[in-house]
C-alpha cells in the first residue's frame, strides 16, 4: 500500500510540474443576452442594440421644413374654404400636416366629399399651395352671394352658391384655361334641396342640369330633392366634388341651377412627406430626421419601435422591444476551481475574465509564471465579419424598402393612395423580415465563434503533435519545458516541434515508465492479496471443523 501511495504522488508531481497552455475566449460580467433561431436569451459578452426606442414627444421640423398645424380646421375645411379657417387662406408651406383631435371646422354645410381620402392624400403630398381665382364674380349673370346659417351666415371661400337673379336662372356657361405651370385643384358642389318649394325658391327651375367637363372628366349632375335628417340645422345636402386641371387644359361648366360654382382653386407645388398626423402633441423648437405621431427622433440605428407611421429619414419599424446583435462571444462564466490556473477555463467549459485586446486567446503556465495573450488575428477577423454583418443587415433592409417605394412612385396618384392604405401590411411584413434576418445572423455569429475557438485549438494541437497531451479542458500539458519565448512560438504559429521532440520523448517515456511500474506493482499486490485472502479463509474453515468435531456437533465416518 505504501508503494501505491508513493507512485500516485509521483504522478501528481509530474503532472503539476508540466508546462501548460490553454486555448479559450473572453468572459465578462455582462448580463447581455440575444435571441437566435433555436435559443432565447443566450448570454453573450457584448451586444449591439439595433433598435431605437426613444422619442422627444414633440412635433418638429424635418429636412423638408416645418409642419402645417391646422388647429380647429380639417384638411377638407381648408381646401373648400370653411369661413372659420380664414387664417389659412394666405397660402402655406409644410413638410407634413397636423390635424387636431378637436378639429370641428370641416364641411359646414352637411354633405359628402367624393373621394375624400384621395383628396386629402393629394393635398398633403404637395409642399405648398397658392389660391388662384378661377371664375370672377362677373362670370355669372345670376346671384352669387348665397350663404347658410350652417356656415355662420357665410359660405365657403373657394366656391360661390349661385341662385336666381330677378326670378330668372338662365343657363350659365363658363370656361377657364389653366395657364399656370402647375396643376390647379378646383372644387364644386351640387345642392339637393329638401323640398320642391325650396328648389323653385332658390333656382326657379324645377328641373336642372349641371355639366362639368375638362379633357379628363365629363360629369353631369341632377339634384335629388327630398328631406334628410337635420344636420347643422339643415335638411338639405351638398355633394362636394373636386378635380385637377392640368396646365393647358380648359374647364367648362354649364348649369341652370343647383350649382355650387368654383371660385378659387389651389395651385399645388413641390413635394412634402405626404403625411397627415392626427395628434395633439405640442409644436416644439426642434429639427428631427424622423417624425411620428408620438414624437420626433434622431438616430443612426437601422430599426425603431416608436410607430409604424413614422416618416422622414427613418429607420425601419419593428414592433419588438429589443433587437440585439451579438458583437462578442457566448458568455460562459469562468469556472472558479481550476487548480493550477485558478479562475480560468478552456473553450469547453467557460471563458477568461482577464483576456483583453481580443476575444480568443491563450493562457499558459511555466517556470516563469502564468501569462495570458489574445490571438489578435482571429479576433480581428471576427470583428470585421460582425461589422460587415451589421452593415449587411442595414443594406438588405434598405434595398427591400427602396424597391417597394420605387415601384409605387411610378404609378398613378390613386395607387399611391392605395399604397398608404396597405402601408400597415407592408410594415408588418418587413418587420417580420427584419426580426428573422437578425435571428439568422445571431445564430451564424455564435456558431462562428464556437468554430473559431475550435479552429484555434486544433491549430495548436497540430503544431504540438506528440510533444503534448490534451487534458480534456481545452488545455495541453507539454512534455518539455517551455519558457515564455517558447509559448509565444506556439501562439504565433512558429513552434518548432523537432526542437523539443527528444526532450518530449524522454519525458513521455519517463511518465509511461512510472505508469508501467505502477501497473506491475498493482498486479503483484493483487496476487498477494488474493493468496492471503484464500489462506485466511482455509484456516478459518479448518478451525471451525476442529471445534465442531471436538464437541460432537460434527462427526466424520469413513467407509471402506
From Swiss-Prot:
Extracellular-side positions: 19-526
Topology term for the membrane: Single-pass type I membrane protein
Recorded GO CC terms: host cell plasma membrane; membrane; viral envelope; virion membrane
Keyword Zinc: no
Entry PTM: Palmitoylated.
Site annotation Cleavage: residues: 338-339
Signal peptide span: 1-18
GO molecular function, one term: host cell surface receptor binding
The keyword Transmembrane helix is annotated on this UniProt entry: yes
Other information: Major glycoprotein, comprises over 80% of the envelope proteins present in virus particle.
Job of this protein: Binds to sialic acid-containing receptors on the cell surface, bringing about the attachment of the virus particle to the cell. This attachment induces virion internalization of about two third of the virus particles through clathrin-dependent endocytosis and about one third through a clathrin- and caveolin-independent pathway. Plays a major role in the determination of host range restriction and virulence. Class I viral fusion protein. Binds to sialic acid-containing receptors on the cell surface, bringing about the attachment of the virus particle to the cell. This attachment induces virion internalization either through clathrin-dependent endocytosis or through clathrin- and caveolin-independent pathway. Plays a major role in the determination of host range restriction and virulence. Class I viral fusion protein. Responsible for penetration of the virus into the cell cytoplasm by mediating the fusion of the membrane of the endocytosed virus particle with the endosomal membrane.
Name the UniProt record assigns to this protein: Hemagglutinin
Amino acid at each position: 500500500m505504501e508503494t501505491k501511495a508513493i507512485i500516485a504522488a509521483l504522478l501528481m508531481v509530474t503532472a503539476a510540474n508540466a508546462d501548460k497552455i490553454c486555448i479559450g475566449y473572453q468572459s465578462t460580467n455582462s448580463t447581455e443576452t440575444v435571441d437566435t433561431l433555436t435559443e432565447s436569451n443566450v448570454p453573450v459578452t457584448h451586444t449591439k442594440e439595433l433598435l431605437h426606442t426613444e422619442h422627444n414627444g414633440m412635433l418638429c421640423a424635418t429636412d423638408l421644413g416645418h409642419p402645417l398645424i391646422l388647429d380647429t380646421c380639417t384638411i377638407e375645411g381648408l381646401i373648400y374654404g370653411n369661413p372659420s379657417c380664414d387664417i389659412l387662406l394666405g397660402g402655406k408651406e409644410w413638410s407634413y400636416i397636423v390635424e387636431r383631435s378637436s378639429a370641428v371646422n370641416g364641411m359646414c354645410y352637411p354633405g359628402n366629399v367624393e373621394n375624400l381620402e384621395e383628396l386629402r392624400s393629394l393635398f398633403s403630398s404637395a409642399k405648398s399651395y397658392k389660391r388662384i381665382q378661377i371664375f370672377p364674380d362677373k362670370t355669372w349673370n345670376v346671384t352669387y352671394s348665397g350663404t347658410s346659417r350652417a356656415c355662420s351666415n357665410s359660405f365657403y371661400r373657394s366656391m360661390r352658391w349661385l341662385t336666381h337673379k330677378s326670378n330668372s336662372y338662365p343657363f350659365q356657361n363658363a370656361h377657364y384655361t389653366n395657364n399656370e405651370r402647375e396643376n390647379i385643384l378646383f372644387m364644386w358642389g351640387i345642392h339637393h334641396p329638401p323640398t320642391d318649394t325650396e328648389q323653385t325658391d332658390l333656382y326657379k327651375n324645377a328641373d336642372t342640369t349641371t355639366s362639368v367637363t375638362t379633357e379628363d372628366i365629363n360629369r353631369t349632375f341632377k339634384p335629388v330633392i327630398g328631406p334628410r335628417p337635420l344636420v347643422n340645422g339643415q335638411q338639405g345636402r351638398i355633394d362636394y366634388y373636386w378635380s385637377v386641371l392640368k396646365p393647358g387644359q380648359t374647364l367648362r361648366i354649364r348649369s341652370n341651377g343647383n350649382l355650387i360654382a368654383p371660385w378659387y382653386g389651389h395651385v399645388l407645388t413641390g413635394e412634402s412627406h405626404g403625411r397627415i398626423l392626427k395628434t395633439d402633441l405640442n409644436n416644439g423648437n426642434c429639427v428631427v430626421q424622423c417624425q411620428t405621431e408620438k414624437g420626433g427622433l434622431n438616430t443612426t440605428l437601422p430599426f425603431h419601435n416608436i410607430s409604424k407611421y413614422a416618416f422622414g429619414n427613418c429607420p425601419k419599424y419593428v414592433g419588438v422591444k429589443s433587437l440585439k446583435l451579438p458583437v462578442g462571444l457566448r458568455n460562459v462564466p469562468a469556472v472558479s476551481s481550476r487548480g493550477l490556473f485558478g479562475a480560468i477555463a478552456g473553450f469547453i467549459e467557460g471563458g477568461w475574465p482577464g483576456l483583453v485586446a481580443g476575444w480568443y486567446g491563450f493562457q499558459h503556465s511555466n517556470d516563469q509564471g502564468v501569462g495570458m495573450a489574445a490571438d489578435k488575428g482571429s479576433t480581428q477577423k471576427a470583428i470585421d465579419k460582425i461589422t460587415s454583418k451589421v452593415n449587411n443587415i442595414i443594406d438588405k433592409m434598405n434595398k427591400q424598402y427602396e424597391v417597394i417605394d420605387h415601384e409605387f412612385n411610378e404609378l398613378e396618384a390613386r395607387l399611391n393612395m392605395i399604397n398608404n392604405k396597405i402601408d400597415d401590411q407592408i410594415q408588418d411584413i418587413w418587420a417580420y423580415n427584419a426580426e428573422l434576418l437578425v435571428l439568422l445572423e445571431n445564430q451564424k455569429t455564435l456558431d462562428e465563434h464556437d468554430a473559431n475557438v475550435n479552429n484555434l485549438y486544433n491549430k495548436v494541437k497540430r503544431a504540438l503533435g506528440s510533444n503534448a497531451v490534451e487534458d480534456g479542458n481545452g488545455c495541453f500539458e507539454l512534455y518539455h519545458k517551455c519558457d515564455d519565448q517558447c509559448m509565444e512560438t506556439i501562439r504565433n504559429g512558429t513552434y518548432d516541434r523537432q526542437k523539443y521532440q527528444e526532450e518530449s520523448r524522454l519525458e513521455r517515456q519517463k511518465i509511461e515508465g512510472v505508469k508501467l511500474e505502477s501497473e506491475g506493482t498493482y498486479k503483484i499486490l493483487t496476487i498477494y492479496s488474493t493468496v492471503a485472502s484464500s489462506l485466511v479463509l482455509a484456516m478459518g474453515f479448518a478451525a471451525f471443523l476442529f471445534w465442531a468435531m471436538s464437541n460432537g456437533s460434527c462427526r466424520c465416518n469413513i467407509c471402506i
